[in-house]
């Protein structure tokens, strides 16, 4: 009888320990801002997928709307020049297009798979977001977007 009680106790303890340590799930933080200035409207939206204190993926969608095609062309050229050096980095993609009077820039980075050393080769300023082991902390990204004037909300 003592052996049965002991085995039951071991089983219950094992269940409690393993059952209560469920794997952390991915969550989302969305940072956004709208700017209206001099006949130009900007909608900025950054969707950050994270697990624990580390970022897994970031998708940014930046929209610039104006009736001035010269301004749109200038923004498009500037965005393409900025992101073109990243085009050969796996797990990093960008797309820039003009739809009517709106420029839409979409950038996606999967930080769980990206070669952060290649990111540093493109621009050493990227070192600000990476830890020594190539991870990106959520607090670093949140601080960066907050400095841009965005409001960030996290999943509960």
Predicted segments, located by residue:
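Intrinsic disorder/low-complexity segments enriched in polar/small residues
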Residues: 6, 22-24
């Amino acid at each position: 009888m003592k052996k049965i009680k002991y085995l039951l106790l071991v089983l219950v303890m094992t269940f409690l320990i393993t059952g209560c340590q469920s794997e952390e799930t991915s969550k989302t933080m969305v940072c956004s801002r709208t700017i209206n200035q001099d006949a130009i409207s900007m909608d900025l939206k950054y969707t950050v997928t994270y697990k624990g204190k580390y970022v897994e993926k970031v998708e940014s969608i930046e929209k610039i709307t104006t009736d001035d095609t010269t301004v749109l062309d200038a923004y498009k050229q500037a965005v393409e020049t900025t992101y073109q050096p990243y085009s050969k980095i796996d797990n990093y993609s960008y797309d820039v297009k003009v739809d009517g009077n709106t420029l839409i820039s979409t950038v996606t980075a999967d930080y769980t798979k990206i070669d952060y050393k290649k990111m540093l080769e493109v621009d050493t300023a990227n070192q600000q977001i990476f830890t020594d082991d190539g991870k990106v902390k959520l607090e670093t990204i949140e601080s960066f977007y907050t400095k841009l004037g965005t409001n960030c909300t996290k999943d509960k």
